[in-house]
Amino acid sequence: MLLITGCNGQLGRCLADLLTDAICTDVKTLDITNADEVNKFVKDNNIDLIINCAAYTAVDMAQSDSLNAKKINVDGPKNLAQTGAKIIHISTDYVFDGYGHLPYTPDMQTNPLSVYGQTKREGEIA
């Protein structure tokens, strides 16, 4: 079974519209920052693939709200990954510093310049 997180966001909504058999969640139906809740949800729904579109996306606000940004962008993906389900994690170009050659490729060195970019990079690693 496929799980799409972040279904209230633009990308999550679009994927939910295309992948109509998927289970779609938002922050109200699944708190990805709560490891126990995530594990139970994945187990109870026989999830074997997760597309993680959930994110703290207030780029500028992340500077002053870094704990919440870290909770959502780092701890959330870590909790999802630790379920054992395969995961597709959506990230951002903010993991790069903007000085590289376009297009960015997965093997390029990252160098986030903001709290938002740093948390998204840590989420990739998680």
State each model region's role.
Residues 2-19:
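N-terminal Rossmann NAD(P)H-binding glycine-rich loop of SDR-like oxidoreductase domains
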Residues 5, 25, 50-54, 87-92:
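SDR active-site strand-loop-helix element
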Residues 12, 59-60, 97-98:
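Glycine/Thr-rich phosphate-binding loops of Rossmann-like dinucleotide-binding domains
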Residues 64-88:
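NAD(P)-cofactor binding segment of oxidoreductase domains
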Residues 71-79, 95-126:
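Catalytic helix-loop patch of NAD(P)-dependent Rossmann-fold dehydrogenases
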